[in-house]
Curated annotation (Swiss-Prot):
Protein name from the UniProt record: Putative cysteine-rich repeat secretory protein 10
Family per record: Belongs to the cysteine-rich repeat secretory protein family.
UniProt source species: Arabidopsis thaliana
Keywords on record: Repeat, Secreted, Signal
Leader sequence segment: 1-26
Domain of life: Eukaryota
Domain Gnk2-homologous: 33-134, 140-252
A Pfam match: Stress-antifung
Compartmental location: Secreted
Length: 255
């Protein structure tokens, strides 16, 4: 289903299990592991040294300053600096957000041991550790594609057009300037669109360190990947360390 280690810039994953996720489980926000990327180009550090100890302590302490679903920090040891960025989904409760990040902290250390650069995604959150300064910057290198194994019935081109239209509408909602910064749903949007007898549900989000302008650029970049990711599929998502979208033919966000 998922590979155990990935170090490529663009990752395509067919998530077969999406076909079997029940609507109720989706609304309960299951904290499913999605995928990770070990960024081997940033090198590795020696195990059990002061760098690793400082990083673990830093991750533990960051869970206590989770005020609005987004955290970032900088630290280092042995003349090396690391940057940490983590964010929860805009509809995740504080308890689910905290639980997801605890899981991400341990998961990323286990799946990418000693990597200086690494990213891990779960359904409710993601975590990014890098020696490259990433704050306020759009990541154009690392993408994760997930899609439902089932194709839509009927006109695929029309469905793709309707999906893009919903995502475009949600993008405008996510970057609205009247939003209050430093709130859990800042630069986050969710909505639905009627497609005859069915409904299409969508969600978009940027990391809260981005400016509204950069959020717009990032969302445009992942919407442009819709044909490559999810052509005619009943559901799909593009994940990136700076922004994300998801759509399904069933409700999956918390109202």
């Amino acid at each position: 289903m998922f590979s155990s280690s990935v170090s490529i810039s663009i990752l395509v994953v067919v998530a077969m299990q999406f076909s079997f996720i029940h609507n109720v489980l989706s609304l309960n926000q299951t904290n499913s592991y999605l995928q990770h990327i070990c960024i081997n180009s940033e090198g590795k550090y020696k195990a059990k040294n002061s760098y690793e100890s400082r990083l673990k302590d830093h991750l533990d302490s960051m869970s206590n300053i989770l005020d609005y679903g987004f955290i970032h920090g900088v630290g280092g040891a042995d003349s090396s600096t690391y940057y940490i960025k983590a964010q929860c989904r805009g509809d995740a409760s504080e308890s689910k957000c905290r639980s997801c990040l605890f899981t991400a902290f341990s998961g990323i250390l286990r799946r990418c041991p000693n990597n200086r650069g690494r990213i891990i995604w779960y359904d409710n959150c993601f975590l990014y550790i890098s020696e490259i300064y990433t704050y306020e910057k759009i990541d154009f290198k690392h993408y994760l594609y997930l899609h439902n194994a089932k194709d839509v019935s009927g006109n695929k081109k029309l469905f793709n057009k309707n999906t893009k239209a919903l995502l475009d509408k949600l993008k405008e909602k996510a970057i609205r300037k009247e939003q209050e910064p430093y709130t859990r749903d800042y630069m986050y949007a969710a909505g639905e669109e009627s497609l005859g007898t069915t409904k299409l549900y969508g969600m978009m989000q940027c990391t809260q360190d981005l400016s509204v302008k950069n959020c717009s650029v990032c969302l445009d970049s992942i919407i442009a990947k819709l044909p490559r990711c999810c052509n005619g599929k009943q559901g799909g998502r593009v994940l990136n360390p700076s922004c994300t979208f998801r759509y399904e033919l069933y409700p999956f966000v918390k109202p």
